[in-house]
Swiss-Prot record:
Species of provenance: Human cytomegalovirus (strain AD169) (HHV-5)
Keyword terms of this UniProt record: DNA replication, DNA-binding, Host nucleus
Pfam families given in the database record: Viral_DNA_bp
Major localization listed first in the record, in broad terms: host cell
Protein name: Major DNA-binding protein
Length: 1235
């Protein structure tokens, strides 16, 4: 995307459209399922989905005409809001909506309590006659549903009722299998600028010409929805209390490009200051910071949203695998509902986490984090950056405020004494938008109930029984099974605690992840990148070719040693330039000094060849044929992994350093494309909150730099802002996106003018429609676009100077005897029946009895000698793994086992002794639940006289076959990178850390550091209260919640590397031929691989393809196929094929009695280095290798890793060593990948 042309991404066209369509019941139900609806409102907030709410080829970015001049029009770039508003004839959609009680009254009460501004329709203006508008486009109003989509730049005009529909340009488009009429909407500035009266050119919510008054689209219900869903929410993010002022400012900002002027500061109120004990200087610093970041975020929201974006893959509704795979409409609704249930985990995190982005909008001055100012009364920028933080703002929602003149204004609301989290808090953070509150309540009715044990489930049961009296505050007894009061009773144990004191915490955000990542155990260390890759990488260009820093984020220093918020890295750790790479100008990583991925790929190749994992999916394919086979396979695997770890230690000692290993950084990217979450309006709402949080956090750096040098000397904060804001704006625009956290890019146009045929707006204002050629100018030749934010984690804890290691990372060796609880426990569970047929005991109990020497004699265990060897092997492997285990995470598949073993051995061999931090992805799953905990399955408001009657009714539901309700839970992914490879929606806590550059530079950098969820009700897998007092894994492990979107909403991209069935067979055949399994003829294994997926004998051309063109080998295989045909063999199992084709070899082996020819002398190395053992190459077979602090010999590897004093002869680590240090004649040489 680095070579995109602005004119191609954003064609000339209207930035708002009306759609007139006739919706059938199926489409209405789909819209009700995906949209935000409430019974009290006729407006439905629907997702912006191509093929459902807009046409399939809908362009999300346009250059829209805004102003006229003689002979042409001036266009501005804008992108469409990621939602659509249905507002006429929506009864059919709302009818499918669940009733949640009187949500409208709840929102009104919240406005009164928190003194929020309410929407007031224009008293002297008549709403647009929608029936006449429908008739003008040939539609019948009683059968036509109307909805609008609008660009970010024009949404204020839509709110003001000033957009002009041009019915003469109506066109027919297709929406979800039906036809719709699309009518463009134009801004009033195109017509106002032609009026003779100069005052008519004034852009305002109230000033309108007679033409706009008569023709403008004014729907009060739409304006009200925008007022609460968009603007009240934005005001909360910006700590601004007057939405109408913000709307007016946004209106003029888009038309007049007034981003560099002060717009909000004169009207701003400073909330949350009264509960802080601040000196006058601290208060001045906090007020100025508050005003600056608010103004910058408001200005740059216009800059970033009025830009050019590409449609996200997840907004193509007609191509969703979920849609294309549905068999009928009911199956589609079931799949869409299950998708929403998956999303309930993310919604729960946003509601139940006290550090959610919904609440993190208060700016505070943390005195404990600040250093005392110098005697001169000044403070440094670093001091302010540590002191001024964003925190939970619920506790300060009812405080007195300061105005622009720093005078105290009394709070005008009606605060309650009980400040426990309740429905009004939810209404507050939803901007008192009924549709949004109702959307949250739907999810709260379907998340799991966490009982405390004190009252169990009796609280919910008693509430439902009490509903029979009809005294419910939410619904009056009409819908108590689904109302918001019942929802809050269900989740009362999971609700967040309103904090009494502010504190610095990470912020929980929900966005879509990007594909590229560095999240394996050691992240960026030892990873080499393809700088010329099309999509870039985490090295220099970043995801999608973003310039400006590698995974280290632009270079810098580790500013202190101690843990930050209990994280694995030092405070500021992870933000500096990454170790393990050579940093170029601007922090760009050019390449790692060592290649860890080479070693890992060798291990993975070995696993493929040994048939331990699937060559394509990576899933386990190992099948234990017996205890001896199990021991042989994993003894060889462990030896190979350990040898690779030793070899890598030698390579690192030659080419790298311990500091580089300790500086390893894990990193992943979060997508800021607004259309990545356009499939759900609730997520779109959270997206805007997240973007404002990101911009304001980054803006703090610019704000503090000017505040330190320019103290407040006037009575008005806005006056100081007027004096300095233009410089502040310029500084932020040039530095905000090149400091390691926020990534943007400039999309440029090669020309500033063009010619096309457009509507003659002068004639249209006079009542005549005409299309004429005219010049089209572009107001800006380049626009900045949001790309992503990068989040990091330092896995290896680095203690500060003079500090002992943290107790959270100290490793205490506790022997673990039971193999079922050890590193290979997942295989013992999986193959228990095969290893011990007819055992009669489950796996865990069996091994408990074995380890306790209490296994009954009547339990069949097979040959005693074989069993003893098997148990000794497992005990030894378990003890060895635990001795070197620095991850403290039990493997659950072969891939995670070999990766963990390799890194554990490498780190221990290299001298690391403490636990390291780790990243974990928790992906959502659906499980069945108890009917009694999900009252929505009752179908009607409860009318029970006692708990016993309710229990009997629930039992009747089960007897009647009512399906058990489903709820989302999570499971840990074996490999966290799969979260990003499956394009997941993720909820992750992020803290934005700031630190100074190297060499006493005044540059301040920032990085996103993964943090923690605050509260016990977020997700039970995150809770730590059930752990023992000495278990500190929760301080070392960082989690993100994920829902996979690949193959659900995103069609998996195949690109050019499609693997057909023949390719898969060829891969398996070549792996079988490469395998060094002495127990079976490799050709017989190849025959088995071919016949395992075919029912007939293959043709010779096919066999020639499977063996990569080797004619002699193909002829040999064809002889075996001919033998099978002659004998009429139909059983193609491996055992039968060996019996038929490998019988002679088996007889020879049995007759030899295990004796073999001694041919070792033929393979002994020769030459000068053979006798001396230089590079580990002169060892005889079976000879032991001595290892010490400076020499690690690797048996069977030439050049595999001795640390040589004079290594100049071969930089790879030994005479004759390979370039990777991996050896040329090792145990299993690396071969060219055939995948």
């Amino acid at each position: 995307m680095s070579h995109e042309e602005l004119t191609a991404l954003a064609p000339v066209g209207p930035a708002a459209f009306l759609y007139f369509s006739r919706l059938n019941a199926e489409t209405q139900e789909i819209l009700a399922t995906l949209s935000l609806c409430d019974r009290s409102s006729s407006v439905v907030i629907a997702p912006l989905l191509a093929g459902l709410t807009v046409e399939a080829d809908f362009g999300v970015s346009v250059r829209t005409p805004v102003l006229c001049y003689d002979g042409g029009v001036l266009t501005k770039v804008t992108s469409f809001c990621p939602f659509a508003l249905y507002f006429h004839h929506t009864q059919g959609i709302v009818a499918f909506t669940e009733d949640h009680g009187d949500v409208h009254r709840l929102c009104e009460d919240a406005r009164q309590k928190y003194a929020l501004e309410a929407y007031m329709p224009e008293a002297d203006r008549v709403p647009t006659d929608l029936a006449a508008l429908c008739a003008a486009v040939g539609c019948q109003a009683s059968e036509t549903t109307v909805h609008v989509v609008v660009g970010n730049g024009l949404k204020e005009f839509l709110f003001a009722g000033q957009l002009i529909p041009c019915v003469e340009e109506a066109t027919t488009v297709r929406l979800h299998g039906g036809e719709a009429v699309r009518v463009p909407l134009y801004p009033p500035t195109l017509f106002n600028s032609l009026q003779l009266d100069a005052e008519a050119d004034e852009v305002s919510l109230d000033a309108r010409s007679a033409f706009v008054e008569a023709r403008g689209l004014y729907v009060p219900a739409v304006s009200e929805t925008l007022f609460y869903y968009v603007y009240t929410s934005w005001c909360q993010s910006l700590r601004f209390s007057e939405p109408r002022v913000l709307i007016e400012a946004a209106l003029r900002q888009f038309v007049h490009d007034s981003q560099q002027s002060v717009k909000l500061a004169p009207h701003k109120r400073y909330l949350g200051y009264m509960s802080q004990r601040l000196s006058s200087l601290e208060k001045d610093h906090l007020m100025l910071s508050d005003a600056v970041v608010c103004e910058l975020a408001f200005s740059f929201a216009s800059v970033f949203f009025d830009s050019a974006y590409q449609p996200a893959e997840s907004m193509l509704f007609s191509e969703w695998p979920l849609v294309t795979n549905a068999t009928d409409h009911r199956d589609l609704i079931r799949a869409l509902t299950e998708l929403k249930l998956h999303l309930s985990t993310h919604v729960a995190a946003l509601v139940f986490s006290a550090n959610s982005v919904l609440y993190q909008h208060r700016l505070v001055y943390l005195q404990s984090s600040a250093r005392h100012p110098s005697a001169g009364g000044t403070a440094s920028q670093e001091t302010l950056l540590k002191a001024i933080q964003f925190t939970n703002g619920l506790s300060a929602a009812c405080e007195d405020v300061y105005n622009d003149a720093r005078k105290v204004l009394k709070f005008q609301g009606a605060p309650l004494k009980d400040e426990r989290y309740g429905p009004q808090h939810l209404a507050l953070v939803c901007g008192t938008c009924p549709q949004l509150v109702s959307g949250f309540v739907w999810y709260l009715n379907r998340v799991s109930v966490y009982n405390t044990g004190l009252s169990g489930s009796s609280t919910l049961t008693n509430h439902l029984v009490g509903c029979a009296a009809g005294l419910c505050e939410a619904c009056g007894g009409t819908c108590c099974h689904t109302c918001y009061q019942t929802a809050f009773v269900r989740v009362r144990t999971r609700l967040p605690v309103v904090p009494k004191q502010p504190k610095k915490e990470p912020c929980v955000i929900t966005v879509q992840s990007r594909f590229l990542n560095d999240v394996d155990i050691l992240g960026s260390f030892g990873r080499r990148y393809n700088v010329d890759a099309k999509d870039g990488g985490l090295d220099g260009k970043g995801d999608d070719g973003v310039p400006g820093g590698g995974a280290g984020g632009g270079g810098g220093r580790d500013v202190s040693g101690g843990p930050s918020d209990g994280l694995g890295g030092g405070r500021g750790g992870g933000g500096g330039g990454d170790s393990g790479g050579m940093m170029g100008r601007g922090g760009r990583m050019l390449g790692a000094s060592v290649d860890r991925t080479y070693r890992l790929n060798r291990i993975l190749d070995y696993c493929r060849k040994m048939r331990l994992i699937d060559p394509v999916t990576g899933e386990d394919t190992f099948s234990a044929h017996g205890k001896s086979d199990f021991v042989a396979v994993f003894s060889a695997l462990n030896k190979f992994v350990d040898d690779e770890a030793l070899g890598f230690v030698s390579e690192v000692r030659l080419k790298s350093s311990r500091d580089e290993v300790a500086g390893a950084t894990q990193a992943f990217n979060l997508d800021l494309n607004p259309y990545a979450v356009a499939f759900q309006p609730l997520l779109a709402y959270a997206y805007f909150r997240s973007v404002f949080y990101v911009i304001q956090n980054v803006a703090l750096i610019t704000a503090t730099s000017y505040i330190v040098d320019n103290p407040l000397t006037t009575n008005l904060v806005s006056k100081w802002m007027t004096q300095h804001f233009q410089s502040i704006h310029g500084a932020f625009s040039t530095t905000s996106s090149r400091k390691g956290f926020l990534f943007t890019k400039q999309i440029k146009s090669s020309k500033n003018s063009d010619h096309d045929r457009l509507l003659d707006f002068r004639l249209y204002a006079q009542g005549t429609y005409a299309v004429v050629p005219m010049e089209i100018k572009l107001s800006r030749l380049s626009v900045p676009t949001l790309i992503m934010v990068r989040v990091k984690n330092r896995p290896i804890y680095r203690a500060g100077k003079g500090n002992a290691g943290s107790v959270f990372f100290r490793r205490d060796h506790v022997p673990r005897r039971n193999p079922a609880k050890g590193c290979l426990g997942f295989l013992l569970y999986r193959h228990h029946e095969r290893l011990f047929p007819e055992c009669g005991l489950p796996c865990l109990q069996f091994w408990q009895k074995v380890c306790s020497n209490a296994l009954p004699k009547n339990v069949p265990i097979g040959d005693m000698g074989e069993f003893n060897a098997f148990v000794k092997f497992l005990v030894a492997v378990t003890a060895d793994y635990q001795e070197h285990d620095l991850l403290d995470v039990a493997p659950d598949c072969v891939l995670s086992y070999v990766e963990s073993r390799f890194h554990n051995k490498f780190l221990c061999y290299y001298g690391f002794k403490d636990y390291i931090g780790s990243l974990h992805g928790l992906t959502t799953r659906l499980t069945t639940q108890n009917h009694a905990q999900f009252p929505h399955v009752l179908g009607a408001s409860p009318r029970f006289s006692s708990p016993a009657e309710f229990a009997l009714h629930v039992k009747g539901l089960k007897t009647a076959g009512v399906p058990a309700p489903m709820a989302a839970t999570v499971a840990r992914e074996s490999l966290v990178r799969s979260v990003f490879e499956h394009r997941s929606l993720v909820t992750v806590p992020v803290s934005v850390e700031k630190y100074a550059g190297i060499n006493n530079s005044k540059e301040i950098y920032q990085f996103g550091q993964i943090g923690y969820f605050s509260g016990n009700g977020v997700e039970r897998s995150l809770n730590v209260s059930s752990m023992s007092g000495q278990d500190y894994r929760f301080m070392r492990q960082r989690y993100l919640l994920a829902t996979r979107l690949a193959d659900v909403l995103i069609k998996r991209s195949r690109r050019e590397n499609v693997l057909f069935d023949a390719d898969l067979i060829k891969n398996r055949v070549m792996l079988a031929l490469d395998a060094e399994n002495l127990d079976c003829d490799p050709e017989v294994m190849a025959v088995y691989e071919i016949l395992s997926v075919r029912e007939e004998i293959p043709a010779s051309d096919d066999v020639l393809f499977f063996v990569d063109g080797c004619e002699a080998l193909a002829a040999s295989l064809m002889d075996k196929f001919a033998a099978l045909q002659e004998q009429g063999v139909e059983d193609f199992s491996l055992e039968n094929l060996r019996r038929v084709l490998d019988a002679d070899a088996q007889r020879l082996t049995d007759a030899a009695g295990g004796e073999v020819h001694d041919l070792s002398a033929l393979f002994a190395p020769s030459g000068v280095g053979a006798a001396s053992g230089v590079g580990g190459g002169g060892l005889l077979l079976g000879e032991s290798v001595a290892g010490n602090s400076i020499c690690f010999g690797v048996p069977g590897e030439t050049g595999g890793g001795c640390f040589l004093v004079n290594a100049g002869e071969d930089e790879a680590g030994g005479v004759g060593g390979s370039s990777g240090g991996g050896g040329g004649s090792g145990l299993l040489p690396a071969k060219r990948s055939r995948l």
